[in-house]
Amino acid sequence: MMMNKIPEINRARGYFLYTADGKRYLDMALDGGRLIMGHRQKGYGQALKNAIDKGILPSFPSPYAHRLKQAVRSLFGAGCHVYLFKSEEHAKATLASHGLEYTLWRPLAFNTDTASSVTNACDPINDPINHKPSSNMDTQKSTATLELPVIPLLPVPAPFAPGVVVSKSELNIVEEQVSPVILAGAMRAVYNLKAFLAEVDYSCWEKAGITETCKGKWRVELPYLYPLCERNQYPAVWDAFFEAGIILSCDYDTPSVLSPDLSDGNRKKLLKLLAEC
């Protein structure tokens, strides 16, 4: 397996991974695309620590469930219905057991126009439990695009990702209780994502001619890259990038993710590989 070729990682920063002996890898896999904002996002670790320090680690009912739902609605619209599960797999299994189809939502992957502007009054940084969201929260976001239930790919590592289902209409499904620690981290990450989507700029890749560079080899949907090679050819492509210090998605069907802030040198190196492989 491709994942087994990755050496022991000692630390991570931004979009790069570092081994104990100092070797650096550009991470374009980003945990299945979850870490679109890069590693070590602001406030995420502190949110986990704050919840742990309160001693409520088991999956008891807690105010964090409501707070996470509020965060999700700030992206998808105040009128949507939000359901929480222990994991993405539990969410998928629940929908499948009810014969419900769903869409996996990747930030910026298609034109759903779900990202609203940053509303700092809705961002419970200091005290998530006692925070009272502002009545000025953006309530104008349309949920018309939610024709199917949506499972958002939350910007947290998979082991720390609760399952979230977002629907335009009410669903006859039963939620699960989720650890407040998991919910607190996810809530912090969703607000981080909201700010990220309002500010991120991938135009550097357009200016560098990425679409023309990748023509016939990769489908470009900034910031995502989908391989156009045959499935059985993808491991060789992955190996070529890995030898050059770049880790692509380990799954053919899951896109690799471009960094919005690579140096000119790293961008040129990556473009050269994309044109060749």
Q: Model-found features: residue ranges?
A:
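Active-site-adjacent loop/helix segments that line or gate small-molecule/cofactor pockets in enzymes
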Residues: M1-F16, D31, I36, A51, ...
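Glycine-rich phosphate-binding segment of PLP-dependent enzymes
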Residues: Y25-L26, L30-P63, Q70-F76, C80
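Short loop-beta-helix segment that forms the pyridoxal 5′-phosphate
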Residues: R73-P107
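Active-site PLP attachment segment
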Residues: R106-Y191
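Structural signature of PLP-dependent enzymes
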Residues: I173-E212, E230
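Conserved PLP-binding catalytic core of the aspartate aminotransferase-like
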Residues: W205-A240, S256-L262
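PLP-dependent enzyme catalytic core of the Aspartate aminotransferase-like
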Residues: A240-C277
